[in-house]
């Protein structure tokens, strides 16, 4: 099977190595030609995944059209806000039988669309039934170290989800399937916002009670938005929801939690981003989801608080106080 991975960051590299280990013919596309040459020469992604060997069997590409031609599966592992422009680079390639698997988590900022909606919009030869996402609690560092990991392949077409499951499943990378792609995508995207909130709590110096409250009430926000868009409420109880939410809010590997922690310590958003070498998807997702939830009339107070802290310079402790002093409500219900 020929599989192309677009994006040579930590996650794209990890998945390329995993797929090559299963015997697939893998091409890994890097956006910058000089970076592609660096990967090819060193057989290691020193910038984003140091210590992991890229096997000789993986073909490094800097020409995206050449990279995707003839692929049975194309994995998009580029930042969410770069997806549309990346897809446009090969929109004229014949893809009638190709499955597109998106692994980036986010909502498109300008349109409020899920990334699985963007793909067939940009690639006219690709139907929604050919599109899948692969989400779940899966830090690249642990997957590349062959630590046990479980994820979910979601598509509106069960057959597509099952093909993705077959392509990626290993003894240490267990893949489940789900046809609720809406719920899976919303859960996987909103969790990055909640992780920023959890990090802010850490940065202020709050303890376990506050973190548990953020995770639990964040799950409620995730569910409300997913259901309002046609997703299933049970999906947020799965791997893309509570699974990814817990790991992202607690892990030292989480970029979004780290960014929030620095905000909680009083650093500006611009300062924190300038010192990060990888994208924290939660920043753009906060802006996109804040706009989307406002338009839909979905109550998402934690998301709103994170938006105010990131983009309106609201002091973190004041934002937390405002959350705590809102009108008392019932715990359950939408």
UniProtKB/Swiss-Prot annotation:
One of its GO terms (molecular function) is NAD binding. Gene3D superfamilies: N-(1-d-carboxylethyl)-l-norvaline Dehydrogenase, domain 2, NAD(P)-binding Rossmann-like Domain. GO terms for cellular component: cytosol. It holds the Pfam family NAD_Gly3P_dh_C. The keyword NADP applies. It is found in: Cytoplasm. Its EC number is 1.1.1.94. Its main location: cytoplasm. Keywords: Cytoplasm, Lipid biosynthesis, Lipid metabolism, NAD, NADP, Nucleotide-binding, Oxidoreductase, Phospholipid biosynthesis, Phospholipid metabolism. It comes from the Bacteria. It catalyses: sn-glycerol 3-phosphate + NAD(+) = dihydroxyacetone phosphate + NADH + H(+); sn-glycerol 3-phosphate + NADP(+) = dihydroxyacetone phosphate + NADPH + H(+). The keyword Membrane does not apply. GO terms for biological process: carbohydrate metabolic process; glycerol-3-phosphate biosynthetic process; glycerol-3-phosphate catabolic process; glycerophospholipid metabolic process; phospholipid biosynthetic process. NADPH binds at residues 10-11, 31-32, 105, 140, 255, 279, 281. Sn-glycerol 3-phosphate binds at residues 105, 136, 138, 191, 244, 254-256. The active site is at 191 (proton acceptor). Pathway: Membrane lipid metabolism; glycerophospholipid metabolism. Catalyzes the reduction of the glycolytic intermediate dihydroxyacetone phosphate (DHAP) to sn-glycerol 3-phosphate (G3P), the key precursor for phospholipid synthesis. Belongs to the NAD-dependent glycerol-3-phosphate dehydrogenase family. This is Glycerol-3-phosphate dehydrogenase [NAD(P)+].
